[in-house]
């Protein structure tokens, strides 16, 4: 590995609302996993919720937008005073030209990207989104040409506010959700080389992955009913046909109504997934078409029963996504990361700037953000860049972990939401690039509190 470059991310003061100060958090920042449900589908063949103008949405250089109601759908409460943020999977379907999609609270500025896509490409990404004016989310489909694109939105769960009050009055155990337990990332399934499941997943088939009690590379998930959700990075590896994959808590009967990963034949692609754990302690992975190998990298689990006075594991969304890294810009060095190289970034200044009504939220152990490889460049002008990957992990790790956050291709932007754990010192992360020369971008959506 080449010498590491230390950098500091300096962020302006960030503001957050809805969550009160320490000691009064209650259910604030706790997660309530839901069985995945599709709450929006603009395709003409779908009868699921759409908004005017009906059908494929406008795409173009004028940043066309539409607004989507987040509250009261798919199991999310209807009251904005109860809901801090919502976890969704957003998919752009067959856009007519190259572009990118942004998602942000209605009424807030949209200055970041969630999805980058080529003409005709169907691609999803996970997002932690806050409702804006009227509890709505604004989606913008940007492109260099005027065109159209369909959009799908699947709700995965929601984060409660400190004022959330449901169930038995005064019974916090009944009102509260789950905390995010961030682990050292580890690969628990790799169908290519054994990995507990030594064969590809076939068409219309599902595979049961035992999550409670899973163990790999020193990371172990408790085998306990209090583990109610999983945060995993699912990677499909070279399917033999264009396909989609879905992760659900219960063994599917037929084709699931939601999707987590859409991928073209022969490609390698990842997507971060938040999913409830089923009563059997497992999650179930479905493949629609062809045969595909797949990887499951565990990033965290969701566990109930935390002390109400503790802060650890609460997820606090930012007012809107914040661009914390963009190595294309001089402010972050303007130099791509080379092959088999890594570099460090300290998020101490960023973490110190996150506040609620002017009061710092305190110690943080991780962030959730959209990581984008802006397109890998060649090592030699006459030799194509090999497909590769980016891995982001705590800078104090002894070695690069055997996981990946996203897979890279020459000159093709690739996004994926990432849970990034900080090192114990200076809240520093390390970015490793496998092949070619890579510029990358990180738009932060939320932070994870520590005690």
Mark where each language-model region is.
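Short edge beta-strands and adjacent beta->alpha junctions
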Residues: 2, 7, 11-451
